[in-house]
């Protein structure tokens, strides 16, 4: 008997979601890589697995696997999908859930319009928490590239590592070439997601993201949060920022640097299926 799955997406950032509460699921790295292939598999940016939690106060364990099979600690778009998945399939009747990932806890609230608000926690800037190999914390870091040039960027953790670069025009930004170099740079020992941010006005930014283990995706929830946090901290943007990604818009609210940052956006069901092998 095969494993049932549901295809979902958040602004085009697409997933297969697996119910590990009612099914026993043990996928290998190679199996995930095969399933992620858009020509010979299902095709997705991440594989999401929801499991029962034995910890008081935590409703579910939320596990995230990139297309390369690597388990990671954060995915904001996936979190919104997990919330709707859990309620739709009767795993919970609650509209507010707490889930645990590999690295963090997340509070998820299903709103009346079926959008989901995600408490992404308090962003962290200390190099050791990102992680980034640097002598001290700084607003901006300089990385030497393969060709001998340097690039200046911000670095932040939203439960997973992010680099954010300010650009004049995201349409012409070298997202794949430069994004890959930065993502695999040895100063980021766990690799890094790379956001290319264009400030539109006091309340809006445009963003493209190169995700570690995936390449460029048309939406990245944690990347949107990382960019909005950097914009608020270092470029004096509003406490409520609209992040425009190729897949659509996300709303980020951050009242102050010591408060949790909140991501709100949609999630959608696409189809159900069964993994046969």
UniProtKB/Swiss-Prot annotation:
Site-annotated residues for Important for dimerization: 271
Keywords, in A-Z order: Amino-acid biosynthesis, Cytoplasm, Isomerase, Lysine biosynthesis
Residues of the site described as Could be important to modulate the pK values of the two catalytic cysteine residues: 162, 211
Alphabetized InterPro entries for the sequence: DAP_epimerase_DapF
Family per record: Belongs to the diaminopimelate epimerase family.
Pathway(s) it belongs to: Amino-acid biosynthesis; L-lysine biosynthesis via DAP pathway; DL-2,6-diaminopimelate from LL-2,6-diaminopimelate: step 1/1
Binding site for substrate: 13, 46, 66, 76-77, 160, 193, 211-212, 221-222
Compartments where found: Cytoplasm
Source organism superkingdom: Bacteria
Protein's name according to its UniProt entry: Diaminopimelate epimerase
Active site residues per record: 75, 220
UniProt function note: Catalyzes the stereoinversion of LL-2,6-diaminopimelate (L,L-DAP) to meso-diaminopimelate (meso-DAP), a precursor of L-lysine and an essential component of the bacterial peptidoglycan.
Reactions the enzyme catalyzes: (2S,6S)-2,6-diaminopimelate = meso-2,6-diaminopimelate
Pfam families: DAP_epimerase
E.C. code: 5.1.1.7
